[in-house]
Amino acid sequence: MSKKLHIKTWGCQMNEYDSSKMADLLGEYQGYTLTEEAEEADILLLNTCSIREKAQEKVFHQLGRWKTLKDKNPDLIIGVGGCVASQEGKAIKDRAQCVDIIFGPQTLHRLPDMIDQVRRGEKAVIDVSFPEIEKFDRLPEPRAEGPTAFVSIMEGCSKYCSFCVVPYTRGEEVSRPSDDIILEIAQLAEQGVREVNLLGQNVNAYRGATHDGGICTFAELLRYVAAIDGIDRIRFTTSHPIEFTQDIIDVYEDTPELVSFLHLPVQSGSDRILTAMKRGHMAIEYKSIIRRLRKARPDIQISSDFIIGFPGETKEDFADTMKLIEDVAFDHSFSFIYSARPGTPAADLPDDVDMEEKKQRLAILQDRITQQAMRYSRHMMGTVQRILVEGPSVKNPMELRGRTENNRVVNFEGQPKHIGSFVDVEIVDVYTNSLRGKFIRGEDEMDLRRNLRPSDILAKHKQDDDLGVTQFKP
């Protein structure tokens, strides 16, 4: 009888990526298969997020539900990972005795050893250290699960914004070697991946080592990835404005594989609040980045993050945020009411904005951005859009679903053979959360590169150095 693993994931795309690697790791080394039902599992893993309010309480509520399963099956192993695990450490075990393993985002690669320790009778295994690049060195071979894939290129953040727990839960910025990233993406392309999303807490701060002792910048990495045959779209998240340098903007000018959509968090439009947040830039500097981006890529659309009701935020500060939203014409946002994160500098500030006022401001902001998004969608009516077909439509499995370059879901009537490939559709209707398309042409009528073997990719761009080591040169 096969051993079963159940993983519950909360939080960001990096957590989703980490959870997929946990599943691959335990499948490869210990033969576990995933199950959607916690009741069927031999191991339960909770991958946590500490961004939202009451994150810790949410964890303990879930552990309380899992405790009933362990009461029935004492051999059940329960593990807690992610940012709350990194933040709380042993305190989780002190409060929830049912937990066997506590691991941080940088130690998930040690899970097989931790499980073995528990099987040998150890009461609790806790490892929330920050061993830097070791995690990436010990991850299993990449495995595609569709035409899109997330690839982690760096972890952590060294910006220490006053409201943010990331530097304390994931550590400071650590970049993967560029050759490792390129090889992983080439392997994914061989498996049919057409779009990659490069992940990092501060992805544009990437500075990865090269095999010859040099440093690969984020702009250079984007061009290397764009040169991999079969990869026709590149996205990345999340970025920081102070690292959004001109060389990255230049890539938008000459690299069509990089999509015309950017998520660039600003958090506030008030210079006073930005200073209190320790963001390291002013609103005018953010607008300067957007202005230069739109010069390089006129059709680019921008989304952002906003924190509403940060300590000391006045009506004037909020008005500055709304002015920025109007000036930039954001297409989408992730916006949240401020809640203090324990251990951050902002947690010591008086939370002096009334909750009803916060809710009202949030509603105003979200309504404005929804209006702007609908305006963009209506402008797409009658246009032909190239979409990557991801699978059946969520609401109607007899139809197909794809995503435009500017990150809009399009549902259309089409043949299953198009799943995993690009098609052109005419936009014929607009809804709040999706578009309606009419099939125009398939990929066989497009001029796209489809050389799927990494060996072919390397051979096409091969260049040996003095030691005979093959370098990848786009």
Swiss-Prot record:
Catalytic reactions on record: N(6)-dimethylallyladenosine(37) in tRNA + (sulfur carrier)-SH + AH2 + 2 S-adenosyl-L-methionine = 2-methylsulfanyl-N(6)-dimethylallyladenosine(37) in tRNA + (sulfur carrier)-H + 5'-deoxyadenosine + L-methionine + A + S-adenosyl-L-homocysteine + 2 H(+)
Gene Ontology, cellular component aspect: cytosol
Positions of [4Fe-4S] cluster 2 binding: 157, 161, 164
Keyword annotations from UniProtKB, A to Z: 4Fe-4S, Cytoplasm, Iron, Iron-sulfur, Metal-binding, S-adenosyl-L-methionine, Transferase, tRNA processing
Residues where [4Fe-4S] cluster 1 binds: 12, 49, 83
GO function term, MF aspect, one: N6-isopentenyladenosine methylthiotransferase activity
The EC number(s) this enzyme carries: 2.8.4.3
Cofactor detail note: Binds 2 [4Fe-4S] clusters. One cluster is coordinated with 3 cysteines and an exchangeable S-adenosyl-L-methionine.
Compartments it resides in: Cytoplasm
Main location: cytoplasm
CDD domains named in the record: Radical_SAM
MTTase N-terminal domain residues: 3-120
TRAM domain segment(s): 378-441
Cofactor requirement: [4Fe-4S] cluster
Function per UniProt: Catalyzes the methylthiolation of N6-(dimethylallyl)adenosine (i(6)A), leading to the formation of 2-methylthio-N6-(dimethylallyl)adenosine (ms(2)i(6)A) at position 37 in tRNAs that read codons beginning with uridine.
PANTHER family per record: CDK5 REGULATORY SUBUNIT-ASSOCIATED PROTEIN 1, MITOCHONDRIAL TRNA METHYLTHIOTRANSFERASE CDK5RAP1
Protein's name in the database: tRNA-2-methylthio-N(6)-dimethylallyladenosine synthase
Gene name as annotated: miaB
